[in-house]
Amino acid sequence: MEVLENCLFSVQKAMQTIDGEIIIVDNNSNDGSKESLPSKFWGVKFIFNNENLGFAKACNQGSKISSGDFILFLNPDSVLSETCLTDCVSFFKTHQDAGAVGVRMLDDKGKFLKESKRGLPSPSASFYKLFGVTAIFPVSKTIAKYYQGHLPENENNPVEVLSGAFMMIKRAVFEKVNGFDEAFFLYGEDIDLSLRISQLGYKNYYLGKISIMHLKGGSTTYNYKYVDDFYGAMKLFVKKHYNDKSTLYRLFLHAGISVRKMLSILALPFR
């Protein structure tokens, strides 16, 4: 709960010059948040679910009771800089083609998190990433496409995929795409949303000049369920967006996902 409190303090500080609201959607956590947070954070709106409804559905819940022109979806293990929100809003106002923006995420040691900017999981990009080739050629435009390794981490650029850990989106755009696809329980929903935003003709911008701290995995337990959810989401994405491709194309993707899932399961005892 301390992690979430630090997140809320940073958001409140970043909103000092912004007319906005903070909404917390709790997916049936058991850390005492329901009992203690409302009394500590006056003015924050809370939704407490009786069961874990998944990331996508929780985000949609929060968006429905929000009222701003921009909606920020933020993981609870994040800490914002004081100018982060105003800088993002300013970018939107000078880039009318922007549908959503993400930022440069750093871990608690200041290390850049590669998932801050990504490409779509095409067969080649997925193969290079899943089997470690990307790590050998981390700045190749072709081989490192999954993490957009050819784009400098501290520059602003349009990218194919933004991270759901920090995604600010225009309300009008979010409503046009009908929000997050709730078929994605956990993982993959940000890839799906990013793609649907671009299909409407808007751009997803990675803002490398704006940084936040993201305690990657702060609310994640690495176990079989995590592996199953993660690779299940990848298969769902393939089924939804690549169903018009050839059978061989889809078989290749599903085979790669299945092999990587098996390897991840085998590696669990060594994490």
Predicted regions and their residues:
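Active-site-adjacent helix/loop segment of glycosyltransferases
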Residues: 192-271
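Short aromatic/hydrophobic "clamp" motif used to bind/position activated sugar donors
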Residues: 71
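Glycine-rich, basic loop-to-helix element that forms the pyrophosphate-binding segment
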Residues: 48-66, 87
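Short, flexible, basic/aromatic active-site loop/helix in glycosyltransferases
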Residues: 120-159
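A conserved acidic beta->alpha catalytic loop
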Residues: 10, 26-35, 51
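Short, acidic, metal-binding catalytic loop of nucleotide-sugar glycosyltransferases
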Residues: 9-19
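A short, conserved alpha-helix in the catalytic core of glycosyltransferases
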Residues: 152-211
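Conserved donor NDP-sugar-binding/catalytic core segment of glycosyltransferases
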Residues: 79-115
